[in-house]
């Protein structure tokens, strides 16, 4: 007990010592070693950097914050099963504040780990609704309530209010193992904003999107999913709200919009 940083450093490298101090939650010592030139990306035998370790424990939030401020790589990748980036690890453990910290600091939410899962996939599997909505709101081109029409077309013409249902939808980029590949968009449909598992995912790059007739009082967007041969008809959450439908149509066409979450 009471060892100075100098005496401890003689026994191990500064880089490894920084890792150990991060685990211990010693923020001041981590800052001191950083100022002395310690490398932030030292990797332990399991492939974890100091930031990855800090993102696995809610008690190390301040350590994670300092490491990021000092320049730690928020997208450091740990190979192997159940691994990935700091964001994957924070999501897996349900650390909502750490997830928000990473996203606001430039963490890439579209990276897939060796299990071919994005951080959003992990959040859905874990059933964490707050983190699912947080990630979607960060990466989305559009998100919000909509109406979905269903049933025979002739019935909708007579009583559309009886053949529509409220849904929660998001237009988001598909995850990728290669950040250099062009983004492909998906329209994700949930029964409600409290559901973590999508009811439907439409690959928009493999769909026909028909521009709404905005001259109609209550226009609708028609999407035909080529892969499932299914047609979807969507309208704004509030009847006659053409602006929201404009946002949805533009988002499906690849133009980012304001995310309403």
Residue ranges and their predicted role:
Residues 8, 41, 75-77, 110:
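Ankyrin-repeat junction/capping positions
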Residues 11, 44, 78-80, 113:
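Ankyrin repeat boundary/linker residues
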Residues 14, 47, 81-83, 116:
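Start-of-repeat signature of ankyrin repeats
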Residues 20-26, 53-60, 89-95, 122-128:
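Ankyrin repeat A-helix N-terminal signature
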Residues 26-35, 59-69, 95-104, 128-136:
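Ankyrin repeat structural motif
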Residues 38, 72, 106-108, 140:
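Ankyrin-repeat C-terminal turn/loop position
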Residues 108-139:
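Leucine-rich solenoid repeat scaffolds
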Residues 141-261:
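Non-catalytic interaction/regulatory modules that flank or connect domains
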């Amino acid at each position: 007990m009471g060892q100075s940083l100098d005496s401890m450093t003689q026994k191990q490298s500064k880089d490894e010592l920084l890792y150990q101090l991060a685990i211990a939650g010693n923020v001041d010592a981590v800052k001191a070693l950083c100022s002395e030139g310690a490398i932030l990306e030292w990797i332990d035998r399991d492939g974890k950097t100091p930031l990855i370790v800090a993102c696995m424990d809610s008690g190390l939030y301040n350590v994670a914050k300092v490491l990021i401020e000092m320049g730690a790589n928020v997208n450091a990748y740990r190979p192997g099963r159940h691994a990935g980036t700091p964001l994957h690890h924070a999501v897996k453990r349900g650390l909502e504040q750490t997830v928000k910290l990473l996203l606001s600091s430039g963490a890439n939410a579209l990276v897939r780990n060796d299990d071919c899962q994005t951080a959003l996939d992990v959040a859905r599997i874990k059933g964490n609704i707050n983190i699912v909505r947080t990630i979607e709101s960060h990466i989305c081109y559009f998100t919000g309530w909509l109406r979905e029409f269903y049933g025979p077309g002739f019935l909708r013409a007579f009583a559309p209010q009886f053949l529509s249902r409220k849904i929660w939808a998001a237009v988001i980029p598909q995850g990728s193992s290669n950040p250099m590949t062009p983004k492909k968009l998906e329209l994700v449909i949930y029964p409600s904003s409290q559901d973590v598992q999508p009811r439907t995912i439409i690959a928009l790059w493999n769909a026909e999107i028909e521009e709404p007739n905005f001259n109609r009082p209550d226009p609708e967007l028609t999407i035909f999913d080529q892969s499932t041969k299914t047609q979807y008809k969507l309208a704004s959450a509030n009847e006659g709200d053409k602006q929201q439908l404009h946002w949805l149509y533009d988002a499906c066409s690849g133009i980012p919009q304001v995310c309403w979450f």
